[in-house]
A protein has these predicted regions:
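Short glycine-rich, Thr/Ser-proximal phosphate-binding strand/loop in the N-terminal lobe
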Residues: 7-45, 49-53, 128, 132-133, ...
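Acidic, glycine/GT-rich loop-and beta-edge segments that sit at the periphery of enzyme/chaperone cores
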Residues: 264-324
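Glycine-rich phosphate-binding/hydrolytic loop that grips phosphoryl groups
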Residues: 95, 142-143, 248-278
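Adenine-nucleotide phosphate-binding core of ATP-dependent small-molecule kinases
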Residues: 177-208
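Conserved phosphate-binding/catalytic loops in two-lobed NTP-binding clefts
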Residues: 84-90, 237-256
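Glycine-rich phosphate-binding loop plus the immediately following alpha-helix
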Residues: 40-44, 122-165, 173, 264, ...
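Gly/Thr-rich phosphate-binding beta-strand-loop-beta motif of the actin/hexokinase/Hsp70
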Residues: 2-28, 104-121, 165, 291-295, ...
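Glycine-rich phosphate-binding loops at beta-strand->alpha-helix junctions
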Residues: 71-73, 212-239, 250-254
Length: 324
């Protein structure tokens, strides 16, 4: 239900390597609208596009009360919009999960190029794991395999559900998985059995790596873009022998979490938002990086400019470059 004119809005922005998500909540933390965009290697342009689209979707007079950013480019997005809160993906995903399923104990989150597992007890994060090195099981790998099999990524999950005799696929490495799939095709196995075999392999790989040593207890939530794939949901349910819940807005949970955190921050702070306004969608931002030689660490420092002026720097082990 769209907010009425004059409604208070909290905006969350989640900028990842593959997708950029925005979510707008009302003062009662109900989702007003959301956006799911491909980052395409252009995080600044996608944040600006998202802001333009969101500005057009919100009714005239809706007041922005707080903005939060998260994701791998959270600092960049936060500087661009002057965010009120900048939080890591673990916190944002967990906050959104607890908001929708208060008794959640395990969150499986698989994005475009990384994956996470979050253990929650009594609404508090007690442990987590991340995999940002290997692409096996991520959305980008599934995209590649769908293209190779000449299947639309949207149809991959439905095809996996048709499998009755899934084949065993080596899922520890993307290279081995792909070669194994080719071998199974050449051996005459049905495509749906290969596809679901891949889903099972990727789910096992996730649990044996990201979930290694973790106590996975229900309720289990599956968040992130890969949760669109019903074959992956089926695979996790089969391996874990428990129901896996896919939240209605699973693909934008990070952005929802950032908006919830912004609402919480503004309630504590009590003053106005730092948000620069939707006009930043037309601003001329630029970025660059350099290697700091102040000590043997040789940190790579990222910096963002607006009209040639440095707005912020980050990435060092100390704060020598953060004092702009």
């Amino acid at each position: 239900m769209p907010p009425s004119s004059g409604a208070e809005v909290y905006l969350g922005i989640d900028v990842g390597s593959v997708t950029t998500k925005l979510a707008a909540l009302d003062e009662e933390d109900r989702l007003i609208d959301s956006l799911y965009l491909r980052t395409q290697g252009k995080p600044i342009a996608m944040v600006q596009q998202g802001l333009r689209e969101m500005a057009n979707r919100l009714p005239a007079g809706a007041g922005m009360r707080g903005v939060g950013t998260t994701g791998s480019a959270r600092y960049l997005a936060g500087v661009m919009v002057s965010a009120d809160v900048i939080k890591n993906e673990i916190t944002s995903q967990a906050v959104a999960a607890v908001h929708f399923v208060p008794d959640v104990q395990t969150v499986i989150e698989i994005g475009g190029q990384d994956s996470k597992i979050i253990m929650i007890r009594d609404g508090i994060v007690t442990d987590f794991g991340m995999n940002t090195v290997c692409a096996a099981g991520t959305g980008s790998f599934l995209d590649q395999q769908a293209q190779r099999l000449n299947i639309r990524i949207e149809d991959l999950g439905q095809m996996a559900l048709q499998s009755q005799r899934p084949v065993r696929i080596a899922g520890r490495c993307t290279v081995f998985a792909e070669s194994d799939m080719i071998h199974k095709q050449q051996s005459g196995h049905r495509i749906e059995d290969i596809v679901y075999g891949l889903c099972l392999a990727l789910a096992r790989n996730y649990l044996n790596n990201v979930g290694l040593g973790k106590e996975i207890l229900p309720p289990v939530l599956f968040q992130g873009g890969v949760a669109f794939n019903r074959g992956m949901v089926r695979a996790f349910e089969e391996i874990l022998n428990t129901k896996v819940i896919v939240p209605r807005h699973h693909e934008v949970m990070g952005a929802i979490g950032a908006a919830l955190l912004a609402h919480e921050e503004m309630a504590v702070r009590g003053n106005g938002t730092r948000f620069k306004g939707f006009e930043v969608a037309e601003a001329d931002f630029g970025t660059s990086s350099f290697e700091c030689k102040a000590c043997p660490s040789l940190c790579e420092i990222a910096q963002v400019f607006l009209d040639g002026k440095v707005l912020a720097r980050w990435g060092g082990r100390c704060d020598i470059w953060e004092r702009v």
